[in-house]
Amino acid sequence: EGLIAYKTLEELLADKDIDTVLIATPNNTHKDYAIAAMRAGKNVICEKPAAMNAGEFAEMMAAAKENGVFLTAHQNRRMDADYRIMKRIYDENMLGEVFRIESRVQGSRGIADTWRRKKEFGGGMLYDWGVHLIDQLLYMVNSPVVSVYAEFQYISQQEVDDNVRLSLTFQNGMSALVEIGTCNYIMLPLWYMAGKTGTAQIDYWNLEGRMNLLIDNDIKFEDEIPNTLVGPSITLAPRSEDTMQVVPLPAAEVDKGYFYHNLLDVLDNGTELWVKPEEVLRSMQIVDLAFVSFKEKNVITCNI
């Protein structure tokens, strides 16, 4: 009740009462639908990935500019609670200078037998979850990406990637790992962040985790080599407990409706978009280089 169904795209685009169109169709259709909508004077929200590659999205950006409308992508996972916690830890320097971030999602059921298993439709886990995790990292780390290396696996079928490992190096020296798996029967941590004065970990979606913080950096090396569980070792011997503090993860503000609250503010008051097209383009450029890296079996240098 209250919803209108249209028989064709043309009929929808001809409706003068519609000012914004949400495109939530298979990935390979986004560009054509978006450009048609923008040429009809409609603002466009695209489900992720916004396009099949950066070139397609650049065409969409040009259409938005030519027709005086806005274009954005539904990168709503910027408001996920786990991400907001890790972003707060990073922003507030709770671990000192961060040198490593690992972000992953893992399951054990493979990819469902839908269009997401078809290459022609833009299936695969890099397009499905990878674009979310890449967007989160780029929104967190204020530094250009200078290298990309990707490994894909095809475990449950051979058409699209169902397991992904993507390594990014940032200009500030920080490294990041994005990992998506669909054949994992023991899960690794959702988030792992290592800094010079502490480490933070979120185990799973239930937000269980902790921070281990350094409170005394004065390492007192023993006169004799300690005998550890891995054998005699000075380097791998555990720190004394009085030099470390285990603390709970901080709270973080989460507004699940913020994406659409922002869009209303853009429409009513001309506010800036929360998910800017330039940010989406940057993520798509990383996706493109991931495919190149896997094909060439090589690290790809860049400045994105």
Where are these regions (language model features)?
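Hydrophobic residues in well-ordered beta-strands that form the structural core
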Residues: 7, 46, 71-73, 102, ...
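C-terminal helix-rich "cap/oligomerization" subdomain common to oxidoreductases
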Residues: 20-22, 58, 171, 247-248, ...
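C-terminal glycine/acidic-rich active-site capping loop/insertion
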Residues: 197-275
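Rossmann-fold dehydrogenase core element
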Residues: 58-76, 96-103
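Beta-loop-alpha module in the N-terminal Rossmann-like domain of NAD(P)-dependent dehydrogenases
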Residues: 3-63
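Predominantly a Rossmann-like dinucleotide-binding segment in NAD(P)-dependent oxidoreductases
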Residues: 77-157, 297
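Glycine-rich phosphate/pyrophosphate-binding beta-alpha loops
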Residues: 179-187
